[in-house]
Amino acid sequence: MRRADGQPVTVLVVDDEPVLAEMVSMALRYEGWNITTAGDGSSAIAAARRQRPDVVVLDVMLPDMSGLDVLHKLRSENPGLPVLLLTAKDAVEDRIAGLTAGGDDYVTKPFSIEEVVLRLRALLRRTGVTTVDSGAQLVVGDLVLDEDSHEVMRAGEPVSLTSTEFELLRFMMHNSKRVLSKAQILDRVWSYDFGGRSNIVELYISYLRKKIDNGREPMIHTLRGAGYVLKPAR
């Protein structure tokens, strides 16, 4: 899903829980969107002025000010800015307060990442920010992945991948130069927590290396104790 002008959607994620903010950000990057994060209200307002996001994911409970105060400020400067509110509060009056303050939609913690993505997609369509879903070519160095045709090329040569290998590579390319832990890969590619007992990630990383690197300068690297990273060959 892209903006009406063909550019990637820019999302501002505002949450004072770093792990949660990173989890949401990673899922949205997987959608091909550009992500900016802020951990408090003041930073959020500054980031919105600097980045001009297309949509905001805003936690109601922030350390320096209420998320609703942030919402009022954002709306005073950009009345049409779509905002999805996140909160641990589940009382009806809290939901009403958030929507009355100008929030376009509301998700209560704990939530599924899939729900956040779907609500953002619907919100972007409803507010006219985006038009139609559009696949994209992901490019990292001489590695190219086409999300529409599922074709993969390395140095101009086709690479044949299984569906799971393709999803793993796509996830790594959306997060190129970022270290991805085994748990993050399991959650995104397999949507299942094996409790650290499975070697399925190691197995599929090995499969990808044989097909992607295959005698060339390596792009897939292991950081012992941390995870895996895909980056352009030197």
Curated annotation (Swiss-Prot):
PTM annotation: Phosphorylated by TcrY.
Protein name as catalogued: Probable transcriptional regulatory protein TcrX
Keyword annotations from UniProtKB, A to Z: Cytoplasm, DNA-binding, Phosphoprotein, Transcription, Transcription regulation, Two-component regulatory system
Positions carrying 4-aspartylphosphate: D59
PANTHER family membership: REGULATOR OF RPOS, TRANSCRIPTIONAL REGULATORY PROTEIN TCRX-RELATED
Outcome of gene disruption: Cells lacking TcrX and TcrY show an increase in virulence in mouse model of infection, with significantly shorter survival times.
Location of the protein in the cell: Cytoplasm
Purpose: Member of the two-component regulatory system TcrY/TcrX.
GO biological process, one term: phosphorelay signal transduction system
GO CC list: cytosol; protein-DNA complex
DNA-binding region: 135-232
GO molecular function: phosphorelay response regulator activity; transcription cis-regulatory region binding
Keyword Magnesium attached: no
InterPro entries in the cross-refs: CheY-like_superfamily, OmpR/PhoB-type_DNA-bd, Sig_transdc_resp-reg_receiver, WalR-like, WH-like_DNA-bd_sf
Residue stretches making up the Response regulatory domain: 10-124
Keyword Transcription attributed: yes
